[in-house]
């Protein structure tokens, strides 16, 4: 597999090697060695999730408080999603900016979203199925959302956007910052550095 860091520090697009024959397809979508090589630390998986979405479903922008937040390693095993990472780390050089990757069941790419970053995706096909590896269990009291239409994200056109009440009524980035719920660049950098020190030790 190969990894390409996105324009948002701490986010990577991972492209696997696809091996096909008369039986079908095989590929490695995650390896500990491959992850450690690009991230500089191991991925401590604590939970695995699966979501199935109709075309037009928009989930996000979601994030968790740091520490420990919740890093995510995400792939799409059926259909296609426009997967977005948003920099919500106050003090970051790219604060308020976004980048995106197409995840689908053809190229089989994944995206890694490190602690403190915001995550969202738009389902482009019915029954789009997304698998997440998560570095921390779901903790609703530490989970937050920011309005997904607040970042100038160039969402692909779909007949109708479908959002949960929580996401549709989420605060703007400015409102979330004023409420003091956004992570800081310094806290995120410090947390990731502890993960890297643990690898060395």
From Swiss-Prot:
What EC number(s) has UniProt assigned to this enzyme?
A: 5.1.3.13
Q: How does it assemble?
A: Homodimer.
Q: Check the record and name the Gene3D superfamilies matching this protein.
A: Jelly Rolls
> What are the boundaries of the signal sequence?
none
Asked if Transmembrane is a keyword of the record, the answer is no
EC category: isomerase
Q: Which domain of life is it from?
A: Bacteria
Ordered alphabetically, the record's keywords are: Carbohydrate metabolism, Isomerase
Q: Name one Pfam family in it.
A: dTDP_sugar_isom
Q: What is this protein called?
A: dTDP-4-dehydrorhamnose 3,5-epimerase
Briefly, what is this protein's role? Catalyzes the epimerization of the C3' and C5'positions of dTDP-6-deoxy-D-xylo-4-hexulose, forming dTDP-6-deoxy-L-lyxo-4-hexulose. Involved in the biosynthesis of the dTDP-L-rhamnose which is a component of the critical linker, D-N-acetylglucosamine-L-rhamnose disaccharide, which connects the galactan region of arabinogalactan to peptidoglycan via a phosphodiester linkage.
Q: Which organism is it from?
A: Mycolicibacterium smegmatis (strain ATCC 700084 / mc(2)155) (Mycobacterium smegmatis)
């Amino acid at each position: 597999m190969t990894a390409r860091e996105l324009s948002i520090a701490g986010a990577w697009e991972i492209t696997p090697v696809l091996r096909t024959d008369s039986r079908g397809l095989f590929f490695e979508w995650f390896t500990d060695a491959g992850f450690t090589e690009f991230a500089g630390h191991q991925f401590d998986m604590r939970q695995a999730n699966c979501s199935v979405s109709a075309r037009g479903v928009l989930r996000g922008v979601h994030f968790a408080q740091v520490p420990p937040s919740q890093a995510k390693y995400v792939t799409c095993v059926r259909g296609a999603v426009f997967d977005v990472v948003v920099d919500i780390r106050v003090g970051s050089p790219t604060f308020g900016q976004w980048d995106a990757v197409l995840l689908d069941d053809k190229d089989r790419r994944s995206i890694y979203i490190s602690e403190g970053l915001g995550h969202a995706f738009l389902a482009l096909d019915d029954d789009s199925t997304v698998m997440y590896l998560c570095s921390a269990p779901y903790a609703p009291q530490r989970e937050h959302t920011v309005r997904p239409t607040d970042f100038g994200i160039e969402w692909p056109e779909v007949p109708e956007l479908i959002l949960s009440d929580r996401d549709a009524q989420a605060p703007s980035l400015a409102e979330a910052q004023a409420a003091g719920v956004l992570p800081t660049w310094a806290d995120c950098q410090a947390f990731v550095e502890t993960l890297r020190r643990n690898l060395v030790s």
